[in-house]
A protein has these predicted regions:
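Single conserved hydrophobic/aromatic residue that forms the stacking wall/gate
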Residues: 272-281
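Structural signal for hydrophobic packing residues in well-ordered secondary-structure cores
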Residues: 42, 46-53, 64, 68-72, ...
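Metal-dependent enolase-superfamily TIM-barrel catalytic cores that perform enediolate-based chemistry
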Residues: 126-271
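Conserved phosphate/anionic-ligand binding catalytic regions in large, soluble enzymes, centered on
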Residues: 73-93, 114-130, 174-177
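Short, mixed charged/polar active-site loops
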Residues: 2-4
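Metal- or metallocofactor-binding catalytic centers and their adjacent structured scaffolds
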Residues: 8-94, 98, 149
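Glycine-rich, aromatic-flanked loop segments that form ligand/cofactor-binding clefts
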Residues: 109-121, 202-213
């Protein structure tokens, strides 16, 4: 038996993320090939995993992590380690003759999480000038995963119609969302709200809007250019967040500030969560 696995890759990555090994000096693929990562799998990793029990996932992962020996997987590369780890898990399921999901700790009452669909791309995922990287929808009142997919499909199709109606392109960005040539976050949000309504749903109840800002890309000298191309202070940025959260009933925001800017993150969180005594101090 055999199993295959592939690893994801992203256009915008944080300082603390696991390292992706690429052949930066290989001109054939403009430095984007992974021949060295594949070679490490076929030699170093393979040599150390030979003879291991395919069902001992924790041990397999521990061997590779220890073999690398760095916090961010910089020697072997996270793409080498993760690909082997996933392939091992898939092969274990195949050997046991059970579906992959049944090899995890949960033994009954299996449930799929509802998806957050990335439907408009901006930031590093598109070249349209939108500051926010991902505009997503979440089908909050779906009765099942298939119903969630249906709801998202209907909203996406109606969004496509609205974008065309506005004379804009329905080309897509890096992650499959539409990337119309607009440079105003509110215009993107207005389109999504209209698509939700056009689909027969209520924004903020049936379907909610969620954002991935990727604010690291929009941070300079303690200021942010999240809401327009102009860099403004943290306090002004939070006021702008407050406006769109309340106007568009935003339910989730990923990376609203730079990865090390915990003070700004806390300020925003305290506006919309019940703080513990420690948070208040």
């Amino acid at each position: 038996n055999s199993a295959k696995a592939i690893c994801p890759s992203g256009a915008s990555t944080g300082t603390f993320e696991a390292f992706e090994k690429r052949d930066s000096n290989n001109k054939k693929y403009l430095g984007k090939s992974v021949l060295n990562a594949v070679n490490l799998i076929n030699t170093k990793i393979s040599k150390n995993l030979k003879g291991q029990n395919i069902h001992s996932q924790e041990k397999i992962d521990a061997i590779m992590i220890n073999l690398d020996g760095t916090k961010q997987k910089k020697k072997l590369g996270a793409n080498s380690i993760l690909a082997v780890s996933i392939a091992a898990k898939k092969l274990s399921a195949k050997e046991k003759k059970i579906p992959l999901y049944k090899t995890f700790l949960i033994k009954k009452n299996f449930k799929l999480p509802y998806p957050m669909m990335n439907i408009i791309n901006g930031g590093a995922h598109a070249n349209n000038g939108l500051r926010i990287q991902e505009f997503m929808i979440r089908p909050d009142r779906a009765k099942s995963f298939s119903d969630a997919m249906r709801i998202c499909f209907v909203v996406i199709k109606n969004l496509q119609k609205l974008i065309k109606k506005n004379g804009l392109s329905t080309s897509v960005g890096d992650e499959g969302g539409f990337a119309p040539m607009i440079n105003n976050n509110n215009q993107a949000l207005d389109l999504i709200v209209s698509a939700i309504k056009m689909s027969g749903f209520v924004n903020g109840k049936d379907v909610s809007i969620c954002l991935d800002v990727a604010a690291n890309e929009l941070f300079k000298k303690n200021k942010y250019s999240i809401h327009s191309k102009s860099f403004i202070s943290v306090d002004k940025s939070i006021k702008e967040y407050k406006k769109i959260i309340e106007k568009y009933k935003i339910k989730s925001i990923e990376d609203p500030f730079a990865e090390n800017d915990w003070i700004s993150w806390n300020k925003l969180c305290l506006l919309y969560t019940s703080p513990s005594p420690r948070d208040k101090t």
